[in-house]
């Protein structure tokens, strides 16, 4: 397969995800397929965003990493010290992705490390490993292109997260401001009673304890639910199950006391 064909295969995958979050596992599998390598896409804090490995590479240590979705902190630091592409790293180098304890098996292995950059900052690392065969110039061009594309996707996800947080904060503020004094007081007591983000509420019990009518509680919950801040489900005589949908709600409620 030519370099152009391999690049197009990567582009096809990204076009398929246009407008929705990219699955980095899919990206890793595509990179693995077109470069014939083992692939790790790692965040700057060492979280494994996506991977695609040959069964031969899976040792106990590698399996533990995949299960925890994190690489060891020491290896993360080594990767973050790499400022530009380092290619054809051998098994004796501490940057190798292959387990040194299996040195005899991977004596001909080669690792290449591509820093993932975006918006003027380091976002993570793309690590490719081959059991044998050096990385050639085409491999490096493709790897650097893949790292650039991954960086753009990470930035897009970050931007989407910031936008979502802003929308959630606005919805929470509007919902709290829509409550009357007694409704706000009722909500504060409800979440004190629940002691967390979700739980079972018996409205009459809270109403009696606080000295407000049950209708105040019902109206307060209805306002929060219509704003998308909470969800509630009646369980009949058992009470009402309540769950917070926007995670910053309780912090904002506390701040508005």
From Swiss-Prot:
Which subcellular locations apply to this protein?
Cytoplasm
GO CC entries: cytoplasm
Q: Which InterPro entries match?
A: CodY, GAF-like_dom_sf, GTP_trans_reg_CodY_C, Transc_reg_CodY_N, WH-like_DNA-bd_sf, WH_DNA-bd_sf
GAF domain, as annotated region: 1-155
Residues in the DNA-binding region annotation: 203-222
Write out the GO biological process terms. negative regulation of DNA-templated transcription
- Keywords assigned: Cytoplasm, DNA-binding, Repressor, Transcription, Transcription regulation
Q: Name one GO molecular function term.
A: DNA-binding transcription factor activity
One Pfam annotation, family name? CodY
Q: Would you say which domain of life the source belongs to? A: Bacteria
Asked if NAD is a keyword of the record, the answer is no
Function description = DNA-binding global transcriptional regulator which is involved in the adaptive response to starvation and acts by directly or indirectly controlling the expression of numerous genes in response to nutrient availability. During rapid exponential growth, CodY is highly active and represses genes whose products allow adaptation to nutrient depletion.
Recorded family membership: Belongs to the CodY family.
Name the UniProt record assigns to this protein: Global transcriptional regulator CodY
Organism this protein belongs to: Staphylococcus haemolyticus (strain JCSC1435)
């Amino acid at each position: 397969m030519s370099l152009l064909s391999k690049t197009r295969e990567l582009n096809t995958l990204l076009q398929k995800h246009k407008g929705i979050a990219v699955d980095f596992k899919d990206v890793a599998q595509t990179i693995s397929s077109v470069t014939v390598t083992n692939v790790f896409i790692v965040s700057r804090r060492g979280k494994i965003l996506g991977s695609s490995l040959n069964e031969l590479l899976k040792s106990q240590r590698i399996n533990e990493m995949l299960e925890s979705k994190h690489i060891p902190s020491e290896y993360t630091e080594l990767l973050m010290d790499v400022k530009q592409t380092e290619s054809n790293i051998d098994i004796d180098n501490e940057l190798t992705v292959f387990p040194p304890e299996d040195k005899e098996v991977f004596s001909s292995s080669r690792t290449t490390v591509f820093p993932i950059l975006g918006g003027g900052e380091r976002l993570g690392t793309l690590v490719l490993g081959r059991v044998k065969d050096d990385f050639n110039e085409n491999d490096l061009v493709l790897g650097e292109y893949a790292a650039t594309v991954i960086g753009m996707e990470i930035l897009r996800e970050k931007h989407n997260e910031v936008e979502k947080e802003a929308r959630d904060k606005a919805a929470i503020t509007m919902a709290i401001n829509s409550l009357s004094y007694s409704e706000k007081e009722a909500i504060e007591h409800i979440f004190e009673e629940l002691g967390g983000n979700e739980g079972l509420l018996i409205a009459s019990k809270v109403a009696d304890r606080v000295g407000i009518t049950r209708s105040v509680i019902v109206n307060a919950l209805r306002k929060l639910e219509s704003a998308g801040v909470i969800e509630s489900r009646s369980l009949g005589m058992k009470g009402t199950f309540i769950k917070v949908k926007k995670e910053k709600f309780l912090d904002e409620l506390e701040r508005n006391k």
